[in-house]
C-alpha cells in the first residue's frame, strides 16, 4: 500500500511513525478503508522537508497536520501532540508537541479512535479493541473533559454509533446531555458535515432518534422534533408524523437530497392540520409549508444553493403522485423538476407510499415507464431543442415584445406534449393558421 512508502521515509529519517485513528478502527472491523492518517514524532517542518519532492497541502500546520499527495492519494500526517485547553470548544489554545505516541493517544476523542499501529504491533492504551468488539462508543479518559474540549465530539459520537451500529456509553451520554448548550458554539458547516454522514448511513433514522435521545434534535432540526407524537388522525396513516417520517427516511436510497427531503417532506402538516366533517385529518398545501421550512433550515446550515433548490423541488412535488400519472403529466413534471431530480422524486414518493397503510406503488412504477418512453423518444425536453426561435417569429412578421415570449411558450408546450411536430415548417404553418386573422406581414 502507498502509505508504507511514506512511513518508510519518515522512519528512515529517524522519526517513529504510526497508523492511527479511523484507518486502524476500520481495519480491525474489516471495513473498507477510506482515509489513511499517520502520526509521527517528526514536527511539521520536518515532515515538509522529508516530502519536499511531493505535493504538500498545509491543512493545519499550526496544529501539526500536513497533507501529502502521493500517487494521486491523499495522506494526512500529524505530529505527536499533547493535551491542551480548548477555550473556543474547537481548537486547542496552544499546540504542545509530544515525543511519545502514548501522550498523543491520550488527547483523542473515543477509545475506538485512540489506537495506533507500528510494524504490525497495536498500541491500545484505552481498550479500544475491547470496545470495538462490544460495539461501544466510549470517551478517552473523562467524557466531560473530552466533550467540553470540542462539542462536535457529541455529533461524532452519534455519527459513529449510527454508522457502526454501536451504543454510546452511559457516562458519555450524560456528558453530551450535560453540555448540550455547547452545540450553539459549533460552526454550522461542521454540524452540517456530521449530519450528512448520519443521513447517508444504512440506518439514518437511528441517528435522528439518537439526537433526540441526547436532547440535541431541538438544536439541529427543531422542526423535526415538533413532529414527535403528532397524531395525523388519518385513515391513510398508521404512524404519527415523526414515525412516518422516520420510515420514509429509511426507505429512501442513500442520496443526500432525497433523504433530507424525506426527513422534512411533511413538516408543514402541523401548521396545515384540521379535521374535516368526518373527523379525518387534512393537510391541504402542506408541501408548500414544508418547502419553506426546509429552505430556512438548509440555509441556516449553509448548504449549497443548488442542493437547496433541488431538495425543495422534491418536497414541493412529493404529492404529485396522488393523481394518476399520464404521459402528459410526467412530461410536465419533468419540465418542473428536471432530469437530475425526477428519479429522486419517484424514490421519495415510493418511500412515502410504503410508509402509509397502502403499499401500492403501481402509479409510480407506471410513471417510471412513461418517463423511459419520453427519455427514449425524440421529443424535445428543453427549449433550446425546439426547431424554432424568437428570430423565426420576427422573420415572419412578429415584433419583439411580450407576445413573442407567449407564442414561443405555446409552441414549446405543444411540441413537448407531442401535439405539434418539432419541425420549423410545421411550426410556421401552425402559427400562420392560428394568427392569420392578425395584420401580419408574412
Regions found by a protein language model. Give the residues of each.
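Catalytic cores of the polymerase beta-like nucleotidyltransferase superfamily
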Residues: 1-442
Amino acid at each position: 500500500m502507498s502509505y508504507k512508502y511514506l512511513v518508510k521515509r519518515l522512519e528512515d529519517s529517524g522519526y517513529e511513525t504510526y497508523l492511527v485513528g479511523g484507518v486502524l478502527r476500520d481495519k480491525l472491523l474489516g471495513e473498507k478503508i477510506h482515509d489513511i492518517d499517520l502520526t509521527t514524532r517528526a514536527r511539521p517542518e520536518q515532515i515538509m522537508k522529508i516530502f519536499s519532492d511531493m505535493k504538500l497541502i498545509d491543512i493545519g500546520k499550526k496544529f501539526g497536520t500536513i497533507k501529502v499527495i502521493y500517487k494521486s492519494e491523499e495522506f494526512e500526517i500529524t505530529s505527536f501532540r499533547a493535551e491542551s485547553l480548548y477555550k473556543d470548544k474547537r481548537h486547542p489554545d496552544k499546540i504542545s508537541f509530544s515525543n511519545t505516541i502514548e501522550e498523543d493517544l491520550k488527547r483523542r476523542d473515543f477509545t475506538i479512535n485512540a489506537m495506533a499501529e507500528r510494524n504490525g504491533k497495536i498500541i491500545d492504551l484505552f481498550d479500544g479493541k475491547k470496545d470495538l468488539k462490544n460495539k461501544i462508543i466510549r470517551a478517552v479518559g473523562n467524557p466531560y473533559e473530552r466533550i467540553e474540549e470540542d462539542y462536535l465530539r457529541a455529533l461524532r459520537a452519534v455519527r459513529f454509533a449510527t454508522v457502526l451500529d454501536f451504543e454510546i456509553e452511559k457516562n458519555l451520554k450524560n456528558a453530551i446531555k450535560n453540555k448540550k448548550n455547547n452545540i450553539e458554539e459549533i460552526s454550522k458547516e461542521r454540524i452540517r458535515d456530521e449530519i450528512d454522514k448520519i443521513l447517508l448511513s444504512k440506518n439514518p433514522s437511528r441517528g435522528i432518534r439518537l439526537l433526540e435521545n441526547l436532547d440535541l434534535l431541538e438544536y439541529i432540526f427543531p422542526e423535526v422534533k415538533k413532529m414527535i407524537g403528532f397524531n395525523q388522525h388519518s385513515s391513510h396513516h398508521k404512524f404519527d408524523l415523526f414515525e412516518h417520517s422516520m420510515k420514509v427516511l429509511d426507505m429512501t436510497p442513500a442520496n443526500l437530497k432525497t433523504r433530507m427531503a424525506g426527513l422534512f417532506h411533511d413538516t408543514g402538516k402541523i401548521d396545515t392540520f384540521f379535521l374535516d366533517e368526518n373527523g379525518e385529518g387534512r393537510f391541504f398545501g402542506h408541501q408548500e409549508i414544508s418547502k419553506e421550512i426546509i429552505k430556512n433550515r438548509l440555509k441556516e446550515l449553509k448548504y449549497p444553493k443548488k442542493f437547496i433548490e433541488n431538495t425543495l423541488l422534491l418536497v414541493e412535488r412529493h404529492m404529485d403522485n396522488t393523481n394518476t400519472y399520464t404521459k402528459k403529466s410526467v412530461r410536465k413534471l419533468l419540465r418542473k423538476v428536471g432530469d437530475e431530480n425526477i428519479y429522486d422524486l419517484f424514490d421519495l414518493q415510493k418511500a412515502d407510499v410504503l410508509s402509509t397503510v397502502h403499499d401500492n406503488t403501481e402509479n409510480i412504477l407506471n410513471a417510471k415507464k412513461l418517463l423511459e418512453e419520453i427519455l427514449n423518444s425524440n421529443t424535445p425536453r428543453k427549449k433550446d431543442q425546439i426547431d424554432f426561435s424568437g428570430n423565426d417569429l420576427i422573420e415572419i412578421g412578429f415584433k419583439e415584445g411580450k407576445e413573442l415570449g407567449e407564442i414561443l411558450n405555446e409552441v414549446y408546450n405543444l411540441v413537448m406534449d407531442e401535439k405539434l411536430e418539432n419541425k420549423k415548417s410545421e411550426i410556421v404553418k401552425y402559427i400562420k393558421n392560428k394568427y392569420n386573422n392578425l395584420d401580419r406581414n408574412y
